[in-house]
């Protein structure tokens, strides 16, 4: 099989994997409202945290990251070049954003993009996660943390393993474009902050 054919097959596989909406499935399994019609309307871990609590959000985060990590890492093991790895990672994110199995209404792609970047190295994964966590703790805005972390990701990659700077920059660009509406709401002071689902008070 030629390298081009293998790359195209992996792009299709990555898109299909990304199209499995972890947020919708976890919410169905746990008897929670559809995240596409509750909270922010975004089927991602942050919105599931709002409507279903930390454990449900953690499950969504794990599976969304896995959707990006698996196809990208498998393609890396197959010897696919760095730019093509970036295209495969983007395909996984596009599957998450526009899922064919869920009416093309998906999330922002942040966790899936992070999952695709994480196999580059533990040091990069730690830098990305630490940046996002610190920014959320400071600002309480998940979207702002994602945008700034996406801007930092190519710089971290260039510093730690410059072979993958261009693919990571491609992913970061997609994430920032996907957050266009969030950026507008942030500028207007209308963006929702991160909050947990409140537990009912016991009598």
UniProtKB/Swiss-Prot annotation:
Compartments, record wording: Cell inner membrane
Regarding protein family, the annotation reads: Belongs to the PlsY family.
What processes does the entry annotate via GO biological process terms?
phospholipid biosynthetic process
Gene that encodes it: plsY
Tell me the SMART domains matching this sequence: G3P_acyltransf
Self-association or partners: how does it assemble?
Answer: Probably interacts with PlsX.
Q: What is its main location?
A: membrane
Could you tell me what this protein is called?
Answer: Glycerol-3-phosphate acyltransferase
EC nos: 2.3.1.275
Q: Which Pfam families match?
A: G3P_acyltransf
* Associated pathway: Lipid metabolism; phospholipid metabolism
Which GO MF terms does the UniProt record name?
A: acyl-phosphate glycerol-3-phosphate acyltransferase activity
